[in-house]
Regions:
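Phosphate/pyrophosphate-binding active-site segments
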Residues: 2-17, 157, 224, 323-419, ...
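Glycine-rich, acidic loop regions that bind phosphate or pyrophosphate groups
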Residues: 5-7, 11, 117-161, 184, ...
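Active-site diphosphate/adenylate-binding microenvironment
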Residues: 23-27, 31-33, 41-44, 49-54, ...
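Active-site nucleophile and cofactor-binding loops and adjacent substrate-binding regions
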Residues: 41-43, 62-73, 88-95, 154-157, ...
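Thiamine diphosphate
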Residues: 116, 124-133, 276, 283, ...
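Glycine-rich phosphate/diphosphate-binding loops that line cofactor/substrate pockets in enzymes
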Residues: 4, 25-35, 77-83, 169-174, ...
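A short, small-residue-rich loop immediately preceding and capping a beta-strand
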Residues: 30, 36-40, 60-63, 81-120, ...
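Conformationally flexible catalytic loops at phosphate/diphosphate-handling active centers
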Residues: 17, 165, 169-228, 363
């Protein structure tokens, strides 16, 4: 990169940098790692980087968000869709603390992400300067759940080293977020051109994630455990799955006729239409599938951490050693035996593990074929809805989505009972078909779905559908302005029941008829969407939904469809009143 003015910057009345500065070198390093989009909210602390984005606008796009939490969620979504670390830029102090919700989400969801934080100048550090925060303490490993690594770059010449290490750390082992702190004066410092044997700092080459392979002895032992089994069950999910890995998993399942359940909010890992699909193992699990997990004699956990949500609050598998034989395959050795003691623990990335499994030869006769068929029949039976009150029939709404959305549509959600309708009734075609279709936070983060959907539209250009609730939407609804600014079309269905529904449900379960802190007085969401530049539609009956959806698919701009949902319709299986009555009877 030339240190002199580039033709792109040679505009009348526009000053261009004469020297190559740290902010420009940083952007060059991002480009070298294949970054095409960075998300963030601008700040004075990293003006030199913003100038670098201007200088390299033909190679990388900086997406301006309206709040740093939304920016971090968009970077997270971009990473899940591309398999490469998402990139987010925020300023010091409140910018970084706002972004922390997205960093925690990326950590719990094992999403590779690099957060760049503009910081106070070096000569004012440790004086509690304006907006100063000790980011190593705030994000660091001592927080046990925020970032994999936190580093400050004090020497402009070492920017390439730190950026490359951040990307490697974010991708390898258990993927996750890395934070790089950028002192303002370091970014503005001139990058020396080098003399003699000392070369000028340059971006380091593109890095791929390192593949960890299963050792042959472990794979042979896995086959032995399969041959000893009568009721095996695969639970697949977690981070690091590619199209090729999902295809290899499907071939492995087909060769051995194994039933496959997808881990919590990784429902696109295995094709939901496949005759071996058993359902999703997570919140609101099919009771019959929960019993299948308990009754199985061999669990093959391929990819998931086996956290609280996938294990039904650590009840589906006994702690610390399950009754079932347990094979746990994970990309990070630190996750193996951390919660559950596995009979066989295999440290391998999903690409490598699935390729090792697909070549395992199965015997001609398998004793569990009827078991596998019954697992799938249980799943199909769970698609049949219960009769619930009100003018909106949510299973029919989901069936219409299934009918009209293209197979590669991306579905996003935040946190709330509203998501359970999609989780139970929508059937993903699976990553093996060539595309990722689900963006959902396993950390249960409210406000994720709207910005994630916008990032999906920007990243893929595919149809994007977001389901949200009245409480969830107002956490990050301001990002509709970002969507309109960048022409990102999403279709949003907002279920408005006038309360924080999940909390109210649990409130009635534990403290029946003693509501507090859960009722909401809401704005006119359709009018609010129109104010941002979306089409805004309100419906009150099931019959109104299909024409509203078809019109949304035809529009060039995004659409928000507000649905007034009866507060009684609190879950896919029952009513709020029934939960209250059950709690009162229990207390009597």
């Amino acid at each position: 990169v030339s240190a002199v003015q580039s033709p792109a910057d040679a505009l009348p009345g526009v000053a261009a940098p004469v020297h190559r500065i740290g902010g420009h070198l940083l952007v060059e390093c991002l480009i070298a790692q294949g970054v095409t989009h960075a998300f963030g909210v601008p700040g004075e602390s990293y003006l030199a980087v913003l100038d670098g984005f201007h200088h390299h606008a033909d190679q990388i796009r900086f997406i301006i968000n309206r709040q740093e939490g939304g920016a971090a969620f968009m970077a997270d979504a971009h990473a899940r869709l591309t398999g490469r670390p998402g990139v987010c830029f925020v300023t010091r102090g409140p910018g970084a603390t706002n972004a922390s919700i997205g960093i925690h989400t990326a950590y719990q969801d094992s999403t590779p992400l690099v957060l760049f934080v503009g910081d106070v100048a070096s000569d004012t550090r440790d004086r509690e300067a304006f907006q100063e925060v000790d980011f190593c303490s705030f994000f660091g490993p001592s927080t046990k759940g925020m970032a994999k690594r936190v580093e400050r770059i004090d020497d402009v010449a070492r920017i390439p080293e730190y950026v490359a290490r951040a990307f490697a750390t974010a991708m390898n082992g258990r993927p996750g977020p890395v934070v790089l702190v950028l002192p303002e004066d370091m970014l503005a410092a001139v990058v020396e051109q080098g003399a003699g044997q000392h070369r000028a700092p340059q971006a380091l080459p593109y890095l791929d994630a390192v593949q960890a392979w299963s050792d042959p002895g472990s794979v042979r032992r896995l086959r032995e455990l399969l041959l000893q089994s009568q009721r095996p069950l695969v639970i697949a999910g977690g981070a690091g799955w590619t199209v090729q890995a999902a295809q290899a998993l499907q071939r492995f399942a087909e060769n051995w006729k194994l039933p496959v359940g997808n881990a919590f909010r990784f429902q696109d890992t295995f094709d939901n239409h496949h005759p071996l699909y058993a359902g999703d193992v997570g919140i609101g699990i099919n009771p019959k599938l929960a019993q299948r997990v308990r009754d199985s004699d061999l669990i093959l956990a391929i990819g998931p951490r086996l956290g609280e949500m996938t294990t039904g609050g650590y009840t589906l598998l006994d702690l610390p050693q399950p009754r079932q034989k347990l094979v746990h395959i994970h990309a990070s050795a630190e996750e193996l035996h951390r919660v559950y003691h596995a009979d066989l623990a295999i440290n391998a990335t999903m690409n490598a593990a699935a390729r090792s499994l697909e070549v395992l030869t199965a015997p001609p006769l398998l004793p569990w074929e009827a078991w596998s068929q019954a697992c799938h029949e249980d799943y199909l039976a769970n698609l049949q809805p219960q009769q619930l009150p009100g003018d909106i029939d949510m299973p029919t709404i989901v069936a219409l989505l299934q009918k009209h959305l293209p197979p590669d549509a991306v579905l996003t959600n935040g946190a709330g009972n509203f998501a359970s309708w999609i989780h139970r009734f929508f059937r993903h075609h699976g990553l093996a078909k060539g595309y990722k279709t689900q963006l959902a936070p396993t950390s249960g983060t409210m406000g994720y779905g709207v910005p994630a959907g916008i990032a999906a539209a920007i990243t893929t250009g595919r149809v994007v559908f977001t389901i949200t609730g009245d409480g969830d939407f107002l956490m990050n609804g301001q990002e509709l302005a970002t969507a309109v600014q960048y022409g990102a079309k999403t279709i949003i269905v907002l279920l408005n029941n006038g309360m924080f529904g999940t909390i109210r449900m649990h409130q009635e379960r534990d403290y029946p008829n003693r509501r507090a802190g859960t009722e909401l007085r809401n704005p006119d969401f359709a009018a609010l969407a129109r104010a941002y530049g979306y089409a805004g539609v309100k419906i009150g009956t099931t019959a109104e939904f299909e024409p509203a959806l078809l019109a949304a698919l035809e529009r060039s701009e995004g659409t928000l469809i507000e649905i007034a949902l009866d507060p009684e319709v609190i879950t896919t299986r029952g009513t709020l009143s029934a939960i209250t009555q059950a709690a009162l009877q229990k207390a009597a």
